[in-house]
């Protein structure tokens, strides 16, 4: 496996409204543990979709880990105008996604609902697996992407779950 799609909940979907929320540190701690394992197992591309929340937190980690591991990052945005209405703090996160080693846009702008399905299929077909923060008990629109992933026979899926986070939280020192 060489390319891994990174995606998961947006901050608001799990009730996080500020970057100072302690849960972000716990999520990042769990994700860092998993990312290191992936990189040591030979992943050399982390592919993002340019979403706030889990993806932006993992992108922060990826940029830190580049000091110690050799891999590249890619952002494949759904639309060229993605994030244009985001506030200033989120614009900085958008800029970080645009600083990836490879940046591509699936479509110039929204035209019809089939773009979402086609985009999901495209990112799955162009990655070897996914690392996703998702729990089927707390459904969001991410369920459509997850369902497509499960249909692929050889597609690796590693989920970060709330149970995983609870385990990390029990041992978390906060540093």
Curated annotation (Swiss-Prot):
A Pfam family assignment: YpsA
Species this protein is from: Streptococcus sanguinis (strain SK36)
NCBIfam families membership: PRK13660.1
Sequence similarity: Belongs to the UPF0398 family.
InterPro entries xref list: YspA (IPR010697)
Protein name: UPF0398 protein SSA_1858
HAMAP family (alphabetical): UPF0398
Taxonomic lineage of the native organism: Bacteria, Bacillati, Bacillota, Bacilli, Lactobacillales
């Amino acid at each position: 496996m060489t390319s891994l799609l990174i995606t998961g909940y947006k901050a608001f979907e799990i009730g996080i409204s500020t970057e100072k929320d302690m849960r972000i540190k716990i999520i990042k701690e769990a994700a860092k543990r998993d990312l290191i394992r992936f990189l040591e197992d030979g992943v050399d591309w982390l592919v993002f979709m340019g979403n706030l929340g889990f993806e932006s937190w993992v992108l922060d980690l990826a940029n830190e880990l580049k000091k110690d591991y050799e891999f590249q990052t890619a952002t494949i945005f759904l639309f060229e105008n993605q994030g244009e209405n985001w506030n200033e703090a989120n614009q900085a996160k958008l800029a970080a996604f645009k600083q990836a080693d490879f940046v591509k846009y699936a479509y110039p702008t929204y035209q019809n609902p089939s773009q979402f399905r086609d985009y999901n299929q495209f990112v799955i077909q162009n990655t070897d697996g996914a690392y996703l923060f998702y729990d089927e008990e707390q459904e969001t629109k991410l369920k459509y992407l997850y369902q497509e992933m499960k249909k692929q026979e050889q597609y690796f899926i590693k989920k970060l779950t709330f149970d995983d986070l609870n385990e990390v939280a029990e041992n978390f020192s906060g540093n």
